């Protein structure tokens, strides 16, 4: 997505110092070099996981670097406090590209101040049509909370189909029935790739915006929601695997 944005010229990476954060940093640098060699990496920080209570020093570094974009795999308090610090510092000219900005606590931290500035990549967004829309609304009505983990819908859809195909509830038979399975879900066709049991599915780029008539379901009662701005078909979103899975005999 970023390769098609000429305004992206200087990117700052800030991630959590554990395997996932290290991978986000590694692959962001590799992909930017391959897709947009002109983009300059102006910072690459790894912060201790769930220990930083004030991200103001990191925001000061981002501001000083001249970055126009930030890529972060942060989640939980490490994302909420990062965005809060950016809002508090008035960092209005920098876009944040995230993975987990819809997870509990982050939308409240985003608030109105982050509208138009925070993007998220994921397999879902809050305002799908069809059966999942009713589930999301029902969950909100019953628990006053957001049902943002659409993978639950995938899981039960696939498990139901696998039981029927296997004509059994034996785990080995059900797992075998899942291999290579394709099914229609809320975000298009989803496939359980046989080689590594990873779901192949479409991905959305969404942007934090004020909820409206077209996208009425907000996040954490903020009056804002993640609005899809780009969709990638599964064959585009899919990446190769080197997995050599050992299956039970």
Model-predicted regions and their roles:
Residues 73-76, 98-103, 121-122:
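Beta->alpha turn/N-cap motifs
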Residues 1-89, 124-134:
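Extracellular/periplasmic Venus flytrap/periplasmic-binding protein
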């Amino acid at each position: 997505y970023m390769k098609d944005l000429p305004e992206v010229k200087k990117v700052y990476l800030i991630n959590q110092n554990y395997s996932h954060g290290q991978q986000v940093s590694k692959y962001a640098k590799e992909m930017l070099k391959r897709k947009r060699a002109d983009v300059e990496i102006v910072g690459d920080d790894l912060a201790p996981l769930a220990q930083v209570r004030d991200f103001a020093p990191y925001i000061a570094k981002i501001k000083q670097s001249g970055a126009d974009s930030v890529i972060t795999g942060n989640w939980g308090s490490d994302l909420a406090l990062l965005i809060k610090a950016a809002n508090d510092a008035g960092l209005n000219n920098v876009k944040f590209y995230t993975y987990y900005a819809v997870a509990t606590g982050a939308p409240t931290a985003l608030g109105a101040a982050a509208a138009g500035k925070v993007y998220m990549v994921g397999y879902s967004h809050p305002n799908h049509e069809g059966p999942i829309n009713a589930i999301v609304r029902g969950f909100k009505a019953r628990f006053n909370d957001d049902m943002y983990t659409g993978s639950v819908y995938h899981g039960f859809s696939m498990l139901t189909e696998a039981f029927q195909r296997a004509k059994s509830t034996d785990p080995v038979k059900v797992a075998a029935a899942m291999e290579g399975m394709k099914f229609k879900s809320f975000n298009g066709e989803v496939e359980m790739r046989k080689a590594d049991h990873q779901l192949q599915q479409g991905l959305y780029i969404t942007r934090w915006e004020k909820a409206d008539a077209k996208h009425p379901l907000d996040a954490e009662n903020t009056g804002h929601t993640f609005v899809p701005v780009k969709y990638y078909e599964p064959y585009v979103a899919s990446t190769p695997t080197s997995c050599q899975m050992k299956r039970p005999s």
